[in-house]
Amino acid sequence: MSVNNEVSADQHNPELEDDTFEHGPPVSLGEKKSLNEYMKMDAEDESLQKWKASLGITGTGYSPSNDRRTVVILKLSLLVDGRDPVDVNMEDAASVEQIRKKGFTIKEGSEFKIGVKFRVQHEVISGLRYVQTVRRRGFVVDKTSTMIGSYGPSETPYDFTSEPDEAPTGMLARGHYEANGKFVDDDKVVHHEFVWAFDVAKSWK
């Protein structure tokens, strides 16, 4: 959330509509394959076996018959050094509605990170990224795309923590913001999309 300091929310920047904002290197597994195809790839190649193991590609995988989702976002966290994490259960509709309506309060100038706990099911996910568009008073003020990585199906959830970000400062930066977040893979499949709100304030309240 690198909203420019001392920038008016009424100043519309058309460059922020561009979909090229990106944090982190691109990750690609090449042509998309099924889990079985990945399992059969060069079984005698030790380096490839290590690569597949790093993605969690095993003989068992994880494919629950009662849940066809491939990426399941379990928890979202606001992480600030010296403060208790603010956790949101993304599987609970009431909690998701709460962050849409009320959201978080972030002290101006503070450094924070976003944590995500998620599970991958059924197939390998290539180039998963978190794309976020922030608006204030209806105008886009920030847009970012953060690479999370490529993962194989596993019953054990994965954890990802973003690089540190800094809340804007100054009287003009304070106020209410709305963010649209979505988790997208290399094939442009949107696996999860949600809306959350936050207020930049002089104190944590």
UniProtKB/Swiss-Prot annotation:
UniProt keyword list: Cytoplasm, Nucleus, Phosphoprotein
Residue ranges of the region described as Disordered: 1-31
Principal location listed in the UniProt entry: cytoplasm
GO MF term (any one): Rho GDP-dissociation inhibitor activity
GO biological process: actin cytoskeleton organization; Rho protein signal transduction
Feature: compositional bias, Polar residues: 1-11
Family matches, as InterPro entries: Ig_E-set, Rho_GDI, RhoGDI_dom_sf
GO cellular component terms listed in the entry, alphabetical order: cytosol; membrane; nucleus
Cellular compartment(s): Cytoplasm; Nucleus
PANTHER family referenced in this protein's UniProt entry, alphabetically: LD16419P, RHO GDP-DISSOCIATION INHIBITOR
Keyword Kinase in record: no
Physiological role: Regulates the GDP/GTP exchange reaction of the Rho proteins by inhibiting the dissociation of GDP from them, and the subsequent binding of GTP to them.
Protein name: Rho GDP-dissociation inhibitor
Pfam family, one: Rho_GDI
Family affiliation: Belongs to the Rho GDI family.
Organism: Schizosaccharomyces pombe (strain 972 / ATCC 24843)
UniProt modified residues of type Phosphoserine: S63
